[in-house]
């Protein structure tokens, strides 16, 4: 079973934004959509352009699903599993994320 890795304090991520962190040599985009301890983590790499930009995307909710729009061409990636909502042939890696004692953790 994989261990949980401490990444940052939850207060380091403003509600409605994302940040990029390095975990196991991979860039991970961590999102805090609301003013709560709920966090999501997906790869920071936009698969259409191979650019490290997803943590700077816009977070939105549509039909009950949270997603982030890439800042480049606005393709949307579902935060729950990394699936591209415009083209299901594309997806980004999803990471298990949680907040424990005020610290954001990723399973790795």
Swiss-Prot record:
GO terms for biological process: nitrate assimilation. NCBIfam families: nirD_assim_sml, PRK09511.1. GO terms for cellular component: cytoplasm; nitrite reductase complex [NAD(P)H]. It catalyses: NH4(+) + 3 NAD(+) + 2 H2O = nitrite + 3 NADH + 5 H(+). Its EC number is 1.7.1.15. Keywords: Cytoplasm, NAD, Nitrate assimilation, Oxidoreductase. The lineage of its organism: Bacteria, Pseudomonadati, Pseudomonadota, Gammaproteobacteria, Enterobacterales. Required for activity of the reductase. Associates with NirB. It is found in: Cytoplasm. Its main location: cytoplasm. InterPro entries: NirD, Rieske-like_NirD, Rieske_2Fe-2S_sf. This is Nitrite reductase (NADH) small subunit. One of its GO terms (molecular function) is 2 iron, 2 sulfur cluster binding.
């Amino acid at each position: 079973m994989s261990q949980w890795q401490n990444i940052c304090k939850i207060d380091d991520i403003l509600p409605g934004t994302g940040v990029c962190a390095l975990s196991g040599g991979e860039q991970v985009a961590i999102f805090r959509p609301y003013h709560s301890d709920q966090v999501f983590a997906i790869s920071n790499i936009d698969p259409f352009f191979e650019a490290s930009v997803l943590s700077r995307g816009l977070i939105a909710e549509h039909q009950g699903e949270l997603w982030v729009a890439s800042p480049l061409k606005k393709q949307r990636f579902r935060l729950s599993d990394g699936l591209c909502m415009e083209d299901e042939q594309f997806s980004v890696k999803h990471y298990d994320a949680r907040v424990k004692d005020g610290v954001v953790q990723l399973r790795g």
